[in-house]
Amino acid sequence: MDAQNKEVDALVQKITGLHAAIAKLPSLSPSPDVDALFTDLVTACVPPSPVDVTKLGSEAQEMREGLIRLCSEAEGKLEAHYSDMLAAFDNPLDHLGMFPYYSNYINLSKLEYELLARYVPGRHRPARVAFIGSGPLPFSSYVLAARHLPDAMFDNYDLCSAANDRASKLFRADKDVGARMSFHTADVADLTGELAAYDVVFLAALVGMAAEDKTKVIAHLGAHMADGAALVVRSAHGHVGFLYPIVDPQDIGRGGFEVLAVCHPDDDVVNSVIIAHKSKDVHANERPNGVVDSTRGAVPVVSPPCRFGEMVADVTHKREEFTNAEVAF
């Protein structure tokens, strides 16, 4: 136990140091310094660890919340940078591999599709899909549309109009996937009747960074999605919670959904995935203490085999490749 506590303390100190260094940067736009610090952060946060960020003290929790906000800002700037680079090509979709984390999106989208097919079999061939928080590089929607859902129409929602403008340019030369992609500038809180039209709704990890905000978003989706529609929520587990918000499956249950599966990958997929579906009967299982038993038994937890080393090697290779090419990253 002492050894485990020392490991936890050492990791928290390392993350705290990285947070301090990142917070001092004059800008979070892509640069060698930004790249190096965030690569160190991701490398520290992905391999298995005994850290449970939900049990950290108040000071560490405050640091973690600030770090997630910094990660969100840096991720947005990184994606905008690469979206502009890709838009310079005649067919941007032929060059998506330039993005150093593209393989993670491929594997994450594949995992989400496989979980949908297994736990919500009636929804693994949806006609209409919404992706909330698609950003300037809508890799997830693209991979799902091109590789797994060839007949589905995708509505991508983001708060930022500039992000949507960038995203739409990437599909200008593709008459198949491009014809099935629409981009909308909107706050999910303002979507009501539209949500009832979707068979599946994907909720990006950084939509609602604070726990209370995420809970409100999920409750809003639960109030307006159609009965039986599937919800795919990206979350975090363990010390990946330093990078992304952690979503409590109970909050999804309280939002009007039945939680069907929770996946905490320990391979090269960083995000956890929660699969649920809208159920009008879920509140019939509410207990006297207000906790909703939304799972009909134990929730299956899926953990793929670890391939973390492959992800680190791939990202390192991409960094060297673009440094040699004198491309700002």
UniProtKB/Swiss-Prot annotation:
Lineage: Eukaryota, Viridiplantae, Streptophyta, Embryophyta, Tracheophyta
Subunit structure: Homotrimer.
Reactions that this protein is recorded to catalyse: 3 S-adenosyl-L-methionine = nicotianamine + 3 S-methyl-5'-thioadenosine + 3 H(+)
Keywords: S-adenosyl-L-methionine, Transferase
One annotated GO biological process: nicotianamine biosynthetic process
GO MF annotations, alphabetized: nicotianamine synthase activity
Name of a matching Pfam family: NAS
Enzyme class: transferase
Induction context: Fivefold increase after iron deficiency.
Function: Synthesizes nicotianamine, a polyamine that is the first intermediate in the synthesis of the phytosiderophores of the mugineic acid type found in gramineae which serve as a sensor for the physiological iron status within the plant, and/or might be involved in the transport of iron.
Source organism superkingdom: Eukaryota
Protein's name according to its UniProt entry: Nicotianamine synthase 8
Homology family: Belongs to the nicotianamine synthase (NAS)-like family.
Enzyme Commission no: 2.5.1.43
Organism in which the protein naturally occurs: Hordeum vulgare (Barley)
